[in-house]
Amino acid sequence: MSPNFKLQCHFILILLTALRGESRYLEVQEAAVYDPLLLFSANLKRDLAEEQPYRRALRCLDMLSLPGQFTFTADRPQLHCAAFFIGEPEEFITIHYDLVSIDCQGGDFLKVFDGWILKGEKFPSSQDHPLPTMKRYTDFCESGLTRRSIRSSQNVAMVFFRVHEPGNGFTITIKTDPNLFPCNVISQTPSGRFTLVVPYQHQNCSFSIIYPVAIKISDLTLGHLHGLQLKKPAAGCGGTGDFVELLGGTGLDPSKMMPLADLCYPFLGPAQMKISCDNAVVRMVSSGKHINRVTFEYRQLEPFELETSTGNSIPEYCLSSL
Amino acid sequence: MMTRWALVVFVVLMLDRILFVPGTPIPTFQLLPQNSLETTPSSVTSESSSGTTTGPSASWSNSKASPYLDTRVILSLDVPIGLLRILLEQARYKAARNQAATNAQILAHVGRR
C-alpha cells in the first residue's frame, strides 16, 4: 500500500467517523439545525454559570473535598465535632461564615484551625508554618462576624465546633483560590504525581501522603542553572543548606517523623523508596538562595508489599505501627 | 505559698473535671498543654506567655488573670489516622458523584440545543 493511498484511507475514515457522529446527532435532534458554535454560546455559558453551588448537611465528624455551602444543625447536644477540609494541592481554602447560631456564653464554640491537627500533631508542623500554633486558631466567639472569612495557608484546614442546644448550628461556604507555588500539601489521593517548587523562598515545604506508599523521585534540582552548568549549593545536608528529606511516621506532624532518607544533591533519574508508614512525607528545606524543585510519583503499597521486606525499604520501623 | 498551692490544686481539679466526660463516644477533643519550647521559624516572633488560651473559653476564662498558670491549651481531635483515611475516601466518593451529576447536567444542556 503506497503512503498516498494510506493517507487517503485515513482521510476517508475520518470523514466517515464525523458523518456517523453527525448522523447520530441528527437522529436525536430530528429536524434541528446543527450548529457546533452553540457549544460556545453565551446562553449556555450563562446557564452553566447559574448552577447552584454544592450543598449538603454537615455531620459531626466530616471531611469535605469540594467547595460549596454546608450546614450543621444539632439534633441533640454535640460536644466533640470537627470537619476537615481538603482541596487540590494547588488550592487555598477559604471558609466563610454565612450564618452562625450558637451560644458562646453557654459553652458552644466554633474554631477554625489553619491546617490539620490530630492527636496533638499538626500539619504543617510548627517548624514549617509561619504562625505559632495559638495564632492558627480563629475563634468565632472571639472575633464574631467581624471576621467572616478565614483563608488557609495550604490545601487543608479544619473547624472544631460544639453545639449544646438542639436546633442551633451554623452555615459555612467553602471556596478555593489558586495557589501558584504550593508549599505544604496533603494529598487527596493515595497515588499521583507532583512537582514541589520553592523559588527563592527561605521556607520548608512538605508533601504528605497519609498512606503507605512507594515514592519514586524522578528529578531533583537544588539550585538554578547558569547555562548548562548547575550551580550547587554550598552545603546540602546536615540540617543546613538546600535538601530534600523523606520522612515516615504514624501521625501528621513531619517534625515528629522518622527521617528515612536525605537527598543532598541534585540528580536525574528514578530513585525509589517504599515507605510503609501510615504517613509518608517528602519535605524540602530551602535556604532561599536558589530555585529548588523535586518531582516525584507515589503509589499506594499493595497489602502483599507491606508483608514482605524487599528492596529499598525500612520495614522494621513502620511495620510496628500497623 | 499556701494560696498558690491552693490555686494550683483548684486548677487541676477544674482540668480534671473538664477532661472527664463520662460516656462520650469517639471522637473526643484533646486539650493539650502547649510546649513553650516548641520550635518556631526564626522569622516568626515568639508568642508571649500572656497570650490568650483556646478551647472552651468559658471554662478557661479565669486563666487569663492567673499569674501562676502558664499552661496554654490547644484543641485537637483524638481520632486515629485510619479514620482520617476513611473520611477522605468518603469525601472523594462524594466528589466523584457530584462531578458525575454536574457532567450529566452539562450534557443535558448541550443535548437540548
UniProtKB/Swiss-Prot annotation, chain A:
This protein's record includes keyword Signal: yes
Chief location of this protein within or outside the cell: secreted
GO molecular function, one term: corticotropin-releasing hormone binding
Record-linked SUPFAM superfamilies: Spermadhesin, CUB domain
GO-annotated cellular components: axon terminus; dendrite; dense core granule; extracellular space; microtubule; multivesicular body; nucleus; perikaryon
Localisation: Secreted
Disulfide bonds: 60-81, 104-141, 183-205, 237-264, 277-318
Signal peptide boundaries: 1-24
Glycosylation sites: 204
Any one biological process term the GO annotation gives: hormone-mediated signaling pathway
Record's keyword annotation contains Secreted: yes
This protein's UniProt keywords: Disulfide bond, Glycoprotein, Secreted, Signal
Tree of life domain: Eukaryota
Annotated family: Belongs to the CRF-binding protein family.
Biological role: Binds CRF and inactivates it. May prevent inappropriate pituitary-adrenal stimulation in pregnancy.
PANTHER family to which the protein is assigned, alphabetical: CORTICOTROPIN-RELEASING FACTOR-BINDING PROTEIN (PTHR10278:SF0)
Protein name: Corticotropin-releasing factor-binding protein
Organism: Mus musculus
Higher taxonomy: Eukaryota, Metazoa, Chordata, Craniata, Vertebrata
Name of the coding gene: Crhbp
From Swiss-Prot, chain B:
Taxonomic classification: Eukaryota, Metazoa, Chordata, Craniata, Vertebrata
Ranges where the record places region Disordered: 37-64
Signal sequence, renumbered to the chain: 1-23
Protein keywords: Amidation, Glycoprotein, Hormone, Secreted, Signal
Gene Ontology MF terms in the entry: corticotropin-releasing hormone receptor 2 binding; corticotropin-releasing hormone receptor binding; G protein-coupled receptor binding; hormone activity; hormone binding
Post-translational modification: Glycosylated.
Disulfide bond as UniProt keyword: no
Compositionally biased tracts (Low complexity): 37-61
GO CC entries: extracellular space
The protein, known as: Urocortin-2
Modified residues (Valine amide): 110
Keyword DNA-binding attributed: no
